[in-house]
Amino acid sequence: MNIFLNNFFTICDAPRAWGVYFQDSASPQMEALVELHDNIMFYLVIVLFGVGWILISIVRNYINTRTPISNKYLNHGTLIELIWTITPALILILIAFPSFKLLYLMDEVTDPSLTVFVEGHQWYWSYQYPDFLNEDDEELEFDSYLVPDSDLEDGALRMLEVDNRVILPELTHVRFIVSSGDVIHSYACPALGIKCDAYPGRLNQFSVLINREGLFFGQCSEICGILHSSMPIAIESVSLEKFLSWLQEQ
């Protein structure tokens, strides 16, 4: 029983076979996105059953009534017209306002403690940590490539593992600056609720706060050529002490 529960409640930070729901949230914005999705689904289910009930009632009434048209002199109904006009408008308002609020909050960049510059290439990612210098007084930077199947270690995820992961401290406001060196790419990591297009010659940015340790995978989400599927993203969240130790090793 314990084995079943442990397997059932394992944190899902990567795509899995037959997965039909979101990956487990690892940031406040992803938690907000999941909550918004669930709220919208609540309204959609009500609309689905309400409209379905009306349609079924009309069909049954048409079949069971000898005279399908109960009142041939009825040209309009003010009450029903008000209902089917005002009700959808109220539902749209209930959906739109939380959506606009979340969109605004996600666009805000909180005062960051750390900045990471990301540049997309065909077909790999380049990272820079402009806040830190290595032993040669140069900015910490590296490239991140897909690990081929022949070099995968036991337990590693195919088409998702990379040779150099992005290491970030947990519970720290991080700003990502995203650009491209060739064609349009898109930097996305579902568990963190982030997706930012990378345009050549243009800088986009977003902010993220990872609220727990873990390894989070993403992929380029803009078709960018023949090896588009070979641009995985691996972000590893560690404690501040481990992050500082990693910096000293670079």
Enumerate the language-model features and the residues they cover.
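Alpha-helical transmembrane segments
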Residues: 37-62
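Non-transmembrane, membrane-proximal soluble domains of secreted or membrane proteins
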Residues: 2-39, 59-250
